């Protein structure tokens, strides 16, 4: 049987493909290269030493999704990464975000049921918790109160999947709530390659370290945290990818609906990350303190005990390795995958 990885050429998707192939799974990758490129998948093949099926397709096109399932009748599980993902852009383009992100999953669900595929793992996010009343965050914390349309698309999609799961006793759903994925494959062959100005902290720091950007902008140093900067639960992307392999095994037990945080359970501040990256690259990272960004919260990290208990999974990498692997990727690929073109 095979696993459909929608959005499999993206940052998390490509690393997950590597781990799936290493675990012996057959995969079908679908991507429209909206925020990714073919070179990422060429490098996945190089790392894994294995080939796989690929379809260039947009998940918002139901006919295209239907064709994938019709031509690959052995698909029995979907890992759904396909979505727009820039928080800031979602605020200025809410219609595009709601249309795209909801349609991708709705189309997949509709086609799945016609092809007797009963397992789906959804790429959700800690953003569904909004501004939590306390930390660490457990899976039974309230969902909602999101501060941007991107986060709200995750809440809505979780609700859709939950309703479908309740309506169909054969459907098994894993909602994986990621915290802050960073890092790159230890080989340095694949990593995060954002189009344009990076939206996330570590790719931005990496661009500063490699000389592509002047300095890091730290948004606020007056939060109620040890050094005044925002605290987040950063997780190595390879650990996150391994969590998806564990989730497949969980779905094989036919749990119905399964919800799980994927994080380390440790919070690191913005300045902690800057200092760790500085050590990794052997350079001082210049930064400037800017005003807080609207919608940012002071601290966010998870209680990962459910993942350990029910998936047999826990994060292996610490912040030092996350930064070292990011630097290894960035220093060898200063222009991302364009370096290879």
Name every feature range the model reports, one short phrase each:
Residues 7, 31, 55, 80, ...:
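Short, flexible active-site loop motifs that bind/organize anionic cofactors or intermediates
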Residues 73, 116, 165, 169, ...:
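Secondary-structure transition/hinge residues
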Residues 201-341:
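C-terminal substrate-binding subdomain of Rossmann-fold SDR/epimerase-dehydratase oxidoreductases
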Residues 185-198, 205-208, 214:
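Hydrophobic, Gly/Ser/Ala-rich alpha-helical and linker tracts in large acyl-processing enzymes
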Residues 113, 192-197, 295, 314:
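A general boundary/transition motif marking the beginning of the first structured unit of a protein
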Residues 1-184:
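N-terminal Rossmann-like NAD(P)+-binding domain of SDR-like oxidoreductases, especially those catalyzing
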Residues 183-185, 222-223:
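Short, basic/glycine-rich phosphate-binding loops at helix/coil junctions
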Residues 98, 147-155, 191-199, 203, ...:
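Short-chain dehydrogenase/reductase
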